[in-house]
Amino acid sequence: MASSRISLRLVRRFASAAADGTTTAPSSGKISVSKAKSTLRKEHDPDKALKIYANVSDHSASPVSSRYAQELTVRRLAKCRRFSDIETLIESHKNDPKIKEEPFYSTLIRSYGQASMFNHAMRTFEQMDQYGTPRSAVSFNALLNACLHSKNFDKVPQLFDEIPQRYNKIIPDKISYGILIKSYCDSGTPEKAIEIMRQMQGKGMEVTTIAFTTILSSLYKKGELEVADNLWNEMVKKGCELDNAAYNVRIMSAQKESPERVKELIEEMSSMGLKPDTISYNYLMTAYCERGMLDEAKKVYEGLEGNNCAPNAATFRTLIFHLCYSRLYEQGYAIFKKSVYMHKIPDFNTLKHLVVGLVENKKRDDAKGLIRTVKKKFPPSFLNAWKKLEEELGLYSKTDAFPSSAKEAAAA
């Protein structure tokens, strides 16, 4: 409760600054928006995230970075179901003089979508006349994105048809069509997405590589390999700019075939002048893991740096899971420590297997150390499952009690 009061004070002070026509920090600890963006990527505590965002010295210095920082802050709050704080934060921006600028206004619609608060996003879109903000495909796309992020996949086509009829200045562009295509793919109907793509082609509109790749991914996931391969060939014929995302979708499918096929595609990427990334190598590592070839998988992991890549959360999650599956818990714990150093700690379900395995193998100190580390890295609202696991395994003690506030967690 105390942390929530602190958050509301920060938000209200930020709102006052916006009303005064400034976006300066409410406290003396000013930071640049770029620094805030970088720090927020590593910060999971919603109160700390809110404080970082509120202390940005000038949100107008980099609008793109500012939008990203705002969306990260909203996601941290949403993870803890702090919807009231999210509403207060986003509504505070409606006092900003830039509210009449459509790109600025659209960030508010998008942010509500990041929190799956679609009704708020819709209301904000409908309020644009009230604030004297013009509408175009920019705000329309923000609304479609908010709907998509809120997982209202069936509503996206409805909005796509209805909104341009209500507001004649809104003309869907290739981004609008791309969002519509993604909504069909996310709902498991790539065949409808292909129909939309054909409509675009009939109108002479560019079908972006992103749209092609989205359909390709959905087809591979449904096991429609022949249709997917035909679409890939069409992309090549039409001269689409094949990028990492497009190749990684093919690699995702190839991992089910064999590690050798994945390696072939990685080599093909390189021959096309593309640089395989962490996602590419994660699929290769997964292909080895799923076939019990852990030594080969570890070589891929250890070779990431040499390939100018850094492990991400999926890298650590995959490797730790399969090491635990093979009962190699000490190796899993070593990988966990690296994930902490990289600020890429895997999810609870992955680490639960590791903790249980460490305890079963009489590595209780390591198990307690892992849980102690997690306590320091995440806010108390994230830790209920960990507390329950501690008690079940007999690891819980009063001296290791979970912090009752974010402040205590930071001091732990």
UniProtKB/Swiss-Prot annotation:
Polar residues composition bias: residue spans: 21-37
Segments of this protein annotated with the region Disordered: 21-43
Gene Ontology MF, one: mRNA binding
A Pfam family hit: PPR
Gene Ontology cellular component annotations, sorted alphabetically: mitochondrion; plasma membrane; ribonucleoprotein complex; ribosome
Classification via InterPro entries: Pentatricopeptide_rpt, TPR-like_helical_dom_sf
Keywords: Mitochondrion, Repeat, Ribonucleoprotein, Ribosomal protein, Transit peptide
Major subcellular location class: mitochondrion
PANTHER family membership: PENTATRICOPEPTIDE REPEAT-CONTAINING PROTEIN 3, MITOCHONDRIAL
The protein's name: Small ribosomal subunit protein mL103 (rPPR7)
Organism from which the protein derives: Arabidopsis thaliana
Upper lineage: Eukaryota, Viridiplantae, Streptophyta, Embryophyta, Tracheophyta
